[in-house]
């Protein structure tokens, strides 16, 4: 029995290292420390009964915290009542946490395995031109007016651009662009 206790007693360097880890955990997550404290008393009994097992770093940290809690004297009845109330809360808290985990797990399964993935697009509305049609319409309109500015109104080379933009562009657009050209507010690169 003495050999088992000596084997589980950490060396000074291990204790120092574990105290650093415990301090870092408590400073990083003060909410979790409150939850861990009630569990320490229940795990202390398990550690004492099962001293033959090897301890992982987490269990070693728990044993260090247990040693500190056992060495702290309880001077008043209020202090002894507080851990008892904490144990009651600890028993209720894991049950509530398990229920939440079960609900979350069922939601995750439902999200991961959908029956079918349906891609739906809006039906084609021929009142509105497609993106490519819009781009080509604007480009041909600009090319036509560049050609007319360079070669004159009667140039036969410019007729093909006129046919292209008149077939692609809605007449409202052409009327608006013509007004903008006259006003000097046309957004395109015209000469």
From Swiss-Prot:
- Give me the disulphide-bonded residues: 137-169, 147-158
Chain positions of motif Cx10C motif: 158-169
Q: Is Transport one of the keywords?
A: no
Composition-biased stretches, type Basic and acidic residues, lie in 16-37, 45-56
Compositional bias of kind Low complexity: 72-98
* One Pfam family in the UniProt entry: COX6B
Q: Where is the composition biased (Polar residues)?
A: 1-14
User: Which keywords has UniProt assigned to this entry?
Assistant: Acetylation, Disulfide bond, Mitochondrion
Place the motif Cx9C motif on the sequence: 137-147
Can you give the residue ranges of the CHCH domain? 134-177
As for subcellular location, the record says: Mitochondrion
- Bias type Acidic residues, positions: 99-114
Q: Which InterPro entries match?
A: COX6B-like, CX6/COA6-like_sf, Cyt_c_oxidase_su6B
CDD domains, A to Z: Cyt_c_Oxidase_VIb
Name the organs or tissues of expression. Answer: Expressed in the whole plant.
Similarity comment text for this entry: Belongs to the cytochrome c oxidase subunit 6B (TC 3.D.4.8) family.
What does the UniProt record say this protein does?
Answer: This protein is one of the nuclear-coded polypeptide chains of cytochrome c oxidase, the terminal oxidase in mitochondrial electron transport. This protein may be one of the heme-binding subunits of the oxidase.
Q: What is this protein called?
A: Cytochrome c oxidase subunit 6b-1
Q: Which organism is it from?
A: Arabidopsis thaliana
Gene encoding the protein: COX6B-1
